[in-house]
From Swiss-Prot:
This is 5'-AMP-activated protein kinase subunit gamma-3. AMP/ATP-binding subunit of AMP-activated protein kinase (AMPK), an energy sensor protein kinase that plays a key role in regulating cellular energy metabolism. In response to reduction of intracellular ATP levels, AMPK activates energy-producing pathways and inhibits energy-consuming processes: inhibits protein, carbohydrate and lipid biosynthesis, as well as cell growth and proliferation. AMPK acts via direct phosphorylation of metabolic enzymes, and by longer-term effects via phosphorylation of transcription regulators. ATP 1 binds at residues 225, 240-245, 285, 306-307. Residues 50-62 have a biased composition (Basic residues). It comes from Homo sapiens (Human).
Length: 489
């Protein structure tokens, strides 16, 4: 490992600060084959100060050069960059031209050593944020926090099962054979997860001995949708606690004649995992900071998960959580510096990108419990809410469900979905739509600009035609040019 990256990786906080002195740092890759723990990495205060000053100067120099239209230099790649200390500043991105307006006369192929986003492995000062609601304040280490359960569900609507689709992929195969079709694929292959990590970020981590109720309240209080789970007995990360787990708890016990919901609240995360998984524990899906962003996209879509922990290969610490939104944001920012593929001018209808068959929807008059049933049975992340005429009037996502905990209303699941949307105290994504005649470039620009996870495809009368998700777009831009169909796998 080269000195710059090794120094950066060593700047992660020690787990002794989260769970006591017995939580020694260890190699996540060696945890199954070794009975002894590696020694914790130690860095002197003078080294930390020098690293902080160098990182600050480099970040602003790099930022200025990109804003002036110059891509980051070859010598600023992830393997040569000094460690970035936490500064309490938000991650900054260069000003870019939207993909829909980008000049097709390219800038040439991207340099392989672009240093696009600096990374900071430590927790930043209060109030800083880098990835909207997904980065949160760090909780005190007194009770240590608990983690996940299952392998987080995929961002897109239900898998297409019908043999007929309103919008077949008429010209997608031909587009992939045209020059420049693989430019985004190569761009993601040439950049590592370290490049997309935030300058300053915070992680909420739960110990598996934490009570379920406290864990879900912690998610709400910090505005995050998932948290890594640390098992102090195994001295390793064992999964992620997600909003999906909260939905499963409500769905399983709301109408149970034997168990009251308040009894489940007192269960520890460890107990809930044992009950639900019944001993079939799956390994935590993770990635290394040295792995390519192409591999990150494939791992997210292939495993139908929403969040991908980036683990330090030496200590096993969580450095960052990659998401579909983060990856598309990274690609969108620097995509305007690349030659423009011709398929960005094609319409959604022509390319057939999205889900158009067997759509999961919910009536606005249906109870919340019905929406939970659909979330569990169909494994979808959001439901278009329609009225009796079939017109889209809202969008009810899994993240809306967690606010039942914040409002102490999870014992009233007979409330209608429409009423639940009207009572939302936090303005979330809302309903953003697109139409079949819009180009793929326009759709990508809108998703990136509005920072949403999906667009609802409607006609002129607001009747539902389909859903275009982040997974659909990343599959089309990055994986399809490589001949990989992770969505259908």
């Amino acid at each position: 490992m080269e000195p710059g990256l090794e120094h950066a990786l060593r700047r992660t906080p020690s787990w002794s600060s989260l769970g006591g002195s017995e939580h020694q740092e260890m190699s996540f890759l060696e945890q199954e084959n070794s009975s002894s723990w590696p020694s914790p990495a130690v860095t002197s205060s003078s080294e930390r100060i020098r690293g902080k000053r160098r990182a600050k100067a480099l970040r602003w120099t790099r930022q200025k050069s990109v804003e002036e239209g110059e891509p980051p230099g070859q010598g600023e790649g992830p393997r040569s960059r000094p460690a970035a200390e936490s500064t309490g500043l938000e991650a900054t991105f260069p000003k870019t031209t939207p993909l829909a307006q980008a000049d097709p006369a390219g800038v040439g192929t991207p340099p392989t050593g672009w240093d696009c986003l600096p990374s900071d492995c430590t927790a930043s000062a209060a109030g800083s944020s880098t990835d909207d609601v997904e980065l949160a304040t760090e909780f005190p280490a007194t009770e240590a926090w608990e983690c996940e359960l299952e392998g987080l569900l995929e961002e897109r609507p239900a898998l297409c099962l019908s043999p007929q689709a309103p919008f077949p992929k008429l010209g997608w195969d031909d587009e992939l054979r045209k020059p420049g079709a693989q430019i985004y694929m190569r761009f993601m292959q040439e950049h590592t997860c370290y490049d997309a990590m935030a300058t300053s970020s915070k992680l909420v981590i739960f110990d598996t001995m934490l009570e379920i109720k406290k864990a879900f309240f912690a998610l709400v209080a910090n505005g995050v949708r998932a948290a890594p789970l640390w098992d102090s007995k195994k001295q390793s990360f064992v999964g992620m606690l997600t909003i999906t787990d909260f939905i499963l708890v409500l769905h399983r016990y709301y109408r149970s004649p034997l168990v009251q919901i308040y009894e489940i609240e007192q269960h520890k995360i460890e107990t809930w995992r044992e009950i639900y998984l019944q001993g079939c524990f799956k390994p935590l899906v993770s990635i290394s900071p040295n792995d390519s962003l192409f591999e990150a996209v494939y791992t997210l879509i292939k495993n139908r998960i929403h969040r991908l922990p980036v683990l330090d290969p030496v200590s096993g610490n969580v450095l960052h959580i990659l998401t579909h939104k983060r990856l598309l944001k990274f690609l969108h920012i620097f995509g305007s510096l690349l030659p423009r593929p011709s398929f960005l001018y094609r319409t959604i209808q022509d390319l057939g990108i999205g889900t158009f068959r067997d759509l999961a929807v919910v009536l606005e008059t249906a109870p919340i419990l019905t929406a939970l049933d659909i979330f569990v049975d169909r494994r979808v992340s959001a439901l278009p809410v329609v009225n009796e005429c079939g017109q889209v009037v809202g969008l009810y996502s899994r993240f809306d469900v967690i606010h039942l905990a914040a409002q102490q209303t999870y014992n009233h699941l007979d409330m209608s979905v429409g009423e639940a949307l009207r009572q939302r105290t936090l303005c979330l994504e809302g309903v953003l739509s697109c139409q079949p005649h819009e180009s793929l470039g326009e759709v990508i620009d809108r998703i990136a600009r509005e920072q949403v996870h999906r667009l609802v495809l409607v006609d002129e009368t607001q009747h539902l035609l389909g859903v275009v998700s982040l997974s659909d777009i990343l599959q089309a831009l990055v994986l399809s040019p490589a001949g990989i169909d992770a969505l259908g796998a």
